[in-house]
Each structure stands twice: as C-alpha cells, then as structure tokens.
Amino acid sequence: VAELAVRCAGVNLRNPFLLASGVWGESGESLAGAWSAGAGGVITKSIGSVPRPGYPNPTIEAYERWGLLNAMGLPNPGIDEYPREIEIARRAGATVIGSIFAGDPEEFARLAVRMAATGVVALELNLSCPHAEGFGTEVGGTPENVEKVVRAVTKAVTIPVIAKITPNTGDA
C-alpha cells in the first residue's frame, strides 16, 4: 500500500485529499462520514458569528449541458451551536480544519479564537464566497483587505491559518 501522508501548512494529513468546505461539512456526522470514506482531512462548513438561514431553494441550478451553479448564501448554525458538530467529527478521529467567515478583521479574529478553542488543527478564512453581502469576496476582494484579515487572525491564534481567496478580482 502506498504511503500518501503529507504535511501541509504545519498540519499532518493521512493523504492530500480533503473534504472541501461546503454543504457536506455542515454536520458532524457528514464530516465523520467523509473521514471514514478516506478523506485525509475535513474542512467544516464556513461558520459565522451568528446563524444564517442562507437562500431559499432552489440553490442549485443546471447550467446548460455542462455544469451546475450553486448559491447557498452562507447558511450555518453560528459559532455558538457548531462546536458540537466538530466534536462528533473529532471523536471519529477526523483531522478537522475549521472554516470561518466574517465582515471585518476584528470579527474574523474573534471567530478564529472561538473556532480554535474547538480543537481544530487549522483555520480556513473564507474570503471568497461571492454570494453573501458583506462577507467573502466583499471582504477579501483586494490584497490589502486579505492582508488585514490574515494579520488579525494570526495575531489571535497559534494554529495554522489558510486564506481561501477569490479568483474574481481584477487586482490579482
């Protein structure tokens, strides 16, 4: 059997295949299921300071013959409720990376401290979601804003921090 373990951003992963942040990472059971199916690590659904219902259905549409488009609107239960889902995944043995989103560097730093306290091994900063006003691309749309967020978060926590940035900017 081939050895696929890797170390990325200071995090040991049993292989380089991760469950990306998204709807499948909303519950502890689905995170644990991805781990049990062989994922090298799992990234949670992006979590904010307060619950968000997201957009009403349909949130996924077929696009001509070649693909699907989705716009969820960052639905999540909020940081007060989500730690129990992380605990379920961690009890299953999963390597969990916590994804967070916020509207400004200070809120990102506060959320980072709360998410780090759950025992996640690293943080993903969602600076790329184009679907929710005041978050994602609106916060991370310029290199200067990304730098402010990353600096605030790395001052607040000691675990690795990964900025998920948008490709949708003219200032790349």
Functional labels for PLM-detected ranges:
Residues 1-172:
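Flavin-dependent oxidoreductase catalytic cores
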